[in-house]
């Protein structure tokens, strides 16, 4: 399970859906939003 540290220090499970939703709200196409989420997930490392 991947976890991310939020700005306030909390740890939260990585949510691909949140990344996609945020990209869509920013005006990205569904295809681009999916690609961004995949790239971010691939770039994360455990630890």
From Swiss-Prot:
PROSITE patterns: ATP_CONE (PS51161). GO terms for molecular function: ATP binding. Pfam families: ATP-cone. InterPro entries: ATP-cone_dom. Residues 2-47 form the ATP-cone domain. Keywords: ATP-binding, Nucleotide-binding. This is Uncharacterized protein AF_1547. It comes from Archaeoglobus fulgidus (strain ATCC 49558 / DSM 4304 / JCM 9628 / NBRC 100126 / VC-16).
């Amino acid at each position: 399970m991947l976890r991310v540290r939020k700005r306030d220090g909390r740890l939260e499970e990585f949510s691909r859906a949140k990344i996609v939703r945020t990209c869509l709200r920013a005006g990205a196409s569904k295809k681009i939003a999916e690609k961004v989420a995949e790239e971010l997930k691939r770039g994360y490392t455990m630890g």
